[in-house]
Amino acid sequence: MFGLNSFTSTIEDLLKKDFIFTNFFSNLDRSSICLRHDIDFSVIDAYKVALIEKDMGIRANYFFMLSSNTYNPISSENRSYIEKISKLGHKISLHFDPSIYDDIDTFFIKEKEFFENIFGVTINIVSLHRPRKFLEDNNRKLKGCNHTYEDKFFKNMKYLSDSAGRDIRSDLKYMIPSNQDKPLHLLIHPIWWTTKSSEPSHTLNNWLEKQNDFLISETARNCRTYQK
C-alpha cells in the first residue's frame, strides 16, 4: 500500500528524532523502539524491508510462521531469504498460531524446537498470530518462553500496529521521545510497505496474482505434462 520509499522515509524520520531501535530485552526507555515484523504472507517482502533496515543501521525482530497456509518457510527459496535476514543482523523467531491447536503447550514446543533446529537459533521470544482467544483465557508465557503480548511488552509499552493495512504514518510523524511516557512496540507487516496501492484489498490482490504466477511456474517445473 505505502511503498518502500514511504517505509524508508518513515524510519529515517524516527531516527532523526533520536529514537533508538532495539530488541525486547534491552534496557528500554521512552526513546526506545522495538520494531516487530510478523510475516503472514511473503518472505520476499520481509527480505526487501530487512535490506533497507540494514542500510539504515537498525535491527528489527522478524517472526515467521511454520503453520502458514500462504507460504512455506522451509522451502529452499524462503529458507534462504530467512537465513539472509538473520545474517543482516536481524532477530528471527517464530510466529506461533495458538488458535489451531487444542494442546497449545505441546505443539508450541514442537514448533519452537523445529524452528530452532532448522535455522540454528535460540528462541527467547515469539509473536502470536490471532492471539485474542489465548489472551482472553490467560496471559502467560508459553512453556517458559516470552511472547510479544505479555504485559511487559504490551500494556507497559505503547503499542502501534499497521494490522489490516492501517495507515500509522501520521501517528509516527508526531512522535518525539520527549513526549513519550513508554517505549514504543511497533508492529509493521512488510506486505503493506513493499508495493504502492490505494487500499489493502488491492495490495492483497496483487500478492495473489504473483502467487498464482508462481504456482503455475512451479506446476510446470514439477510436471512436464502440464500445459499452461
Which residue stretches match the model-derived regions?
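Beta-strand-loop-alpha-helix segment that lines the small-molecule cofactor/substrate pocket
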Residues: 91, 95
